[in-house]
């Protein structure tokens, strides 16, 4: 009997592998097997794959094993029963996890429409106990998890202090100096040679090559000596190398200082070579050695870049842009007004025929804390945003080639003033003027001046908002209005008392629409769509803007766009810059921090300035990436502060600790008695400076400043929406599509367009008393919210929610009769569906009706265009999956911008897209709800739609919109 049991037990072990895949799905077992989920053969199984078949041998093993199991004694079954229940729960859990993974993969491959996304969130909220409970639980869990991850990362960083931080790109005192100058000779094909000298902590990597900006590798100026174990020897070698570079450069600098006339036709090319071999003047040599001593006093590597160009006269702006000048790029990166100064300089050179390069030096008179040599034409010395190794990698990735393209596009745009504002720095050039006149520098936060014809006309018709933060000033969609935004905080409020007096209140939005495109409604709409896409998915939005020519395809151009343009969610800016997976995002972050000057600032105050532009919040890895770049830039700007610590990485650890302190001190989820005290803050930073403590006075100062003033991000367009959301009280029913506001009004992509007072008309054929059914209308870029004044106080007004309508599929109609002379009718106009009247309004006067309907129609067109773009993208993806081997598309290349199929292939797919099922594009709740009512209809998402997917072909070269 015992032998038989051992034999059956061995058969059970063999049958477990065969019955595994069959029994996990819960299907009815075969009559031959007699197994089920409760059998012990299903217990020892891992993740299972459905759909597998069983061989005859497997059936035999299974039946015998099952027979042997149930033929056994009763006590054996009772002892195994708890284990079987545990096995069932484990298998069920694994099946649920697999289902979640499949749903995630599907969600990544197909983008749902906005109404389906809202419905998805609504279903999750219903599943987990309702909106309030779900939101509170999700917020608590997310906050706790992020705090846990931040603390975990902080402890990891503390424990890794002894490791080499070069892999983390904290090159704390790394100085990159770029010397460029222009001279009197005229050359038609200029090139730049980049020569780099780098000394790391181990004394290696001396003389690493840096590709030139034209993409070609230049000859090495210095050979790499053998690595030395003594760091002092490496510094000595650096001094020698630096001296040789300074000697070779000194004569060229001296020639530039001689202020030779532009009338000289040419200078032999050997002059430059002779200048490199001659000895420099003692004054210049001594000065550069003093700079060298200051640089080599810190610990990290020092990198020298010398961009040498044959001396050439200033070319006209249309020709100068063809030369990929690193000097132009560097000057454009200067914070404050240096970029504008450069454009003013270029204009002077274009106008003056006899000016020498020495007279161009006022463009560099702006004081900079970085290393600089006075009175040199176009001389820039720029600290790095990256290590020398990574810079070489970026050059190999042709980011410098993109920079050259950016320079060429700038040059072409400068040549035509009407396109100029969008390629160069937007703050220094007047709009649509026949000549380019320099203007005085303005701060980074200042906004563009506008041509006021359309603005004055619209302003005479309606009252503008006093608020001028990012959201309230950036959103009007009218065709005749271009409004300007500012970051002044003195007029941020919504001015509720003003709203209650005005019948129409338009939100300004100058930075959303470029004055150069004031007559191009479609172009401005595309720009706003790009901003909306960025505020939903940053990478997708940047790609959209680059493809349409609004943003240069360079890290420098994208960095300028993120810092200078309004209408971008600061939260999404942080999401984009904190992406560690994409090298382009990392390059943009380097350029962004290079725009900021943290000289002579305390660490917490510099961090406050950094966080004012970029919201440092989210996943711990992204926060670490942002703080890493900030710390690098801070140490470059403050080499004296770095020398106060034993290890430069202490700056990074301290900055990370400040973020933790600010989060802990101002988080509403942390109880007051559990908030971080001063002693806790000091204790957390004990021994982080290579075993030494940071001076207690420094930590006390940081703690007190954070306690008195929170690290906050500047307001953006979302801030204004949040203020409106706080003013709306009462029950907000959760209804999809047209019946409710939903759980959250303030979203990163939502902005306020206008505020208007209208009167609701229940029945257009019946009269009503004057002033009855007064409604306060808030028009957002994707939503129309109808409210009623709930309570009016002296300094505030609250509104009760009535209805909300999605703008997708909305149609705006006008009507007039003897009772309502200024009637407005809103209907649902999905192609092929029944027209449904949503609501009727009567405006107080014809002017308000015109302005409101213009804004509403433009907002509806914007939403429709975004949905069309989404469906186009899905069509291309579906076409690539269903018809990957289309013969007519085999010879067509993919677009370089995003890798999508060419437009000709896409247009062909519309005519012969029978392989695509209609259900694949029915991603709207309208499609789902109307499917049962009508047997066959056309929708915006189907191939039978009458919507024409014709690409927009601009009649002018793509330029950067303001």
From Swiss-Prot:
The keyword Phosphoprotein applies. GO terms for cellular component: glutamatergic synapse; nucleus; postsynaptic density, intracellular component; Schaffer collateral - CA1 synapse; synaptic vesicle. Keywords: Coiled coil, Cytoplasm, Cytoplasmic vesicle, Guanine-nucleotide releasing factor, Lipid-binding, Nucleus, Phosphoprotein, Synapse. Residues 273-292, 365-375, 429-445 have a biased composition (Basic and acidic residues). It is found in: Cytoplasm; Nucleus; Postsynaptic density; Cytoplasmic vesicle, Secretory vesicle, Synaptic vesicle. One of its GO terms (molecular function) is lipid binding. The modification Phosphoserine is found at residues 89, 105, 107, 180, 248, 252, 511, 514, 891, 923-924. GO terms for biological process: actin cytoskeleton organization; dendritic spine development; positive regulation of focal adhesion disassembly; positive regulation of keratinocyte migration; positive regulation of synapse assembly; postsynaptic modulation of chemical synaptic transmission; regulation of ARF protein signal transduction; regulation of postsynaptic neurotransmitter receptor internalization. Residues 773-865 form the PH domain. Its main location: cytoplasm. Residues 1-96, 264-292, 311-333, 348-516, 921-962 are annotated as: Disordered. Residues 8-19, 470-488 have a biased composition (Low complexity). Residues 516-709 form the SEC7 domain. Pfam families: IQ_SEC7_PH, Sec7. InterPro entries: IQSEC_PH (IPR033742), PH-like_dom_sf (IPR011993), Sec7_C_sf (IPR023394), Sec7_dom (IPR000904), Sec7_dom_sf (IPR035999). The keyword Transmembrane helix does not apply. It comes from the Eukaryota. Residues 30-39, 939-948 have a biased composition (Polar residues). Guanine nucleotide exchange factor for ARF1 and ARF6. Guanine nucleotide exchange factor activity is enhanced by lipid binding. Accelerates GTP binding by ARFs of all three classes. Guanine nucleotide exchange protein for ARF6, mediating internalization of beta-1 integrin. Involved in neuronal development. In neurons, plays a role in the control of vesicle formation by endocytoc cargo. Upon long term depression, interacts with GRIA2 and mediates the activation of ARF6 to internalize synaptic AMPAR receptors. The PH domain mediates interaction with lipid membranes that contain phosphatidylinositol-4,5-bisphosphate, but does not bind membranes that lack phosphatidylinositol-4,5-bisphosphate. Belongs to the BRAG family. This is IQ motif and SEC7 domain-containing protein 1. It comes from Rattus norvegicus (Rat).
